[in-house]
């Protein structure tokens, strides 16, 4: 009887140990997102392989088309990625005159063009991923008491700008010239010493302050930002990439030149097919030389992240966005611009890129007219996204 009790206790102890061990295995499998012991073993093998991945540091804005990279839903194949949220001025400065601590980084398209053409910069190569694009008609602000009703009325006027050669300002001058016939030399430019949006944009790189020959350009008073100049009447209008303080605060004599800028910008796209590009993605060339597969892997990851954004917009944007008519906005955008209205790749963006190359050269900013083939890594020339 005593032996039977001992055996029963031993069996019970063994059973408990087995159940405890099984629970531990199941818990570990759950953490790894697998549903079986065999899945756990496979995941463990995968984890051990991942130690051979390339560690890379990526920088960019926190924006919906990149969110899946930031939160880890999308990974760059073959890489262990660390994503750092940064502002464009700081990213530009890091690349052109700083420590180049980012292996992959969002970059201002026009500052990169100027660094490449004018300064012989070759530290990074761009890939045809464009995290930020923006129609720019909305970015012209005026004093309402200066008789400015249309772009042609800017002739002879004083127009303030924070900086001069940023991507946004280069697009703006080009659009005003080619769509409305007002050349940069017909305007009196005043560069403000401060920018009311500097906290959001970060420190401007030197490539954003290139002043060409042959224009009427003066510096605004020290200590005054662009909004001070517009509010005081020292200038008649303002070109600004963001929303200037004077407009945000509702100054009674400050307005947009195009009050219905949505219609104006939609008409511009219908006419030209151009969705202006502001930022691209660039990769350090020494990293590419050692890992020639990386440009394609980065392109694919950004494309996958954008696909998740599209899917969210179609299904759930009305939940996560505070705009009450967001669903109609999405539908109308797709009707005008297509399902993939934010395209990556060279083919879909060739016209927009070459238009900015033209604007930069004819405005006296880039020392020569650049080409797509020299600015973008050769391995990315024919990369295409999966169909939306």
Regions found by a protein language model. Give the residues of each.
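Long, low-complexity C-terminal extensions of enzymes
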Residues: 345-388
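C-terminal segment of N-terminal export signals and the immediately downstream linker at the start
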Residues: 11, 34-59
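N-terminal export signals
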Residues: 17-40
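Short helix-initiation/N-cap motifs at beta->coil->alpha
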Residues: 84-95, 187-228, 374-381
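N-terminal secretory signal peptides
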Residues: 1-17
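Secondary-structure end/capping motifs
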Residues: 282, 287-362
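Short, glycine-/small- and polar/acidic-enriched structural segments
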Residues: 47-51, 55-198
């Amino acid at each position: 009887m005593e032996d039977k009790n001992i055996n029963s206790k031993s069996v019970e102890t063994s059973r408990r140990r087995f159940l405890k061990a099984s629970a531990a295995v199941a818990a570990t499998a759950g953490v790894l997102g697998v549903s079986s012991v065999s899945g756990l073993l496979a995941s463990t093998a995968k984890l051990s392989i991942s130690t051979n991945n390339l560690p890379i540091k990526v920088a960019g804005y926190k924006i919906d088309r990149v969110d899946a990279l930031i939160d880890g839903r999308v990974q760059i194949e073959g890489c262990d990625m660390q994503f750092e949220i940064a502002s464009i001025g700081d990213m530009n400065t890091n690349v052109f005159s700083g420590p180049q601590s980012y292996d992959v980084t969002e970059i201002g398209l026009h500052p990169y063009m100027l660094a490449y053409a004018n300064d012989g910069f070759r530290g990074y190569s761009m890939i045809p991923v464009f995290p930020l694009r923006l129609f720019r008609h909305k970015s012209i602000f005026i004093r309402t008491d200066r008789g400015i009703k249309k772009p042609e009325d800017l002739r002879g006027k004083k127009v303030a700008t924070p900086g001069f050669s940023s991507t946004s300002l280069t697009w703006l001058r080009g659009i005003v010239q080619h769509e409305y016939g007002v050349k940069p030399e017909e305007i009196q430019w005043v560069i403000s010493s401060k920018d009311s949006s500097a906290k959001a944009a970060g420190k401007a790189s030197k490539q954003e302050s290139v002043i060409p020959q042959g224009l009427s350009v003066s510096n605004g008073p020290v200590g005054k930002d662009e909004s001070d100049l517009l509010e005081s009447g020292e200038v008649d209008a303002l070109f600004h990439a963001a929303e200037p303080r004077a407009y945000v605060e509702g100054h009674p004599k400050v307005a947009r030149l195009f009050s219905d800028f949505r219609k104006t910008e939609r008409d511009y796209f219908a006419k030209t097919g151009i969705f202006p590009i502001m930022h691209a993605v660039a990769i350090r060339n020494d990293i590419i030389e050692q890992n020639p597969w990386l440009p394609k892997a980065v392109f694919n990851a950004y494309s996958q992240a954008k696909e998740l954004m599209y899917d969210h917009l179609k299904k759930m944007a009305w939940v996560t966005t505070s705009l009450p008519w967001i669903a109609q906005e999405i539908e109308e955008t797709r009707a005008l611009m297509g399902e993939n209205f934010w395209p990556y790749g060279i083919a879909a963006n060739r016209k927009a890129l070459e238009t900015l190359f033209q604007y930069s050269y004819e405005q006296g900013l880039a020392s020569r007219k650049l080409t797509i083939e020299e600015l973008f890594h050769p391995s990315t020339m024919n990369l295409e996204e999966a169909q939306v």
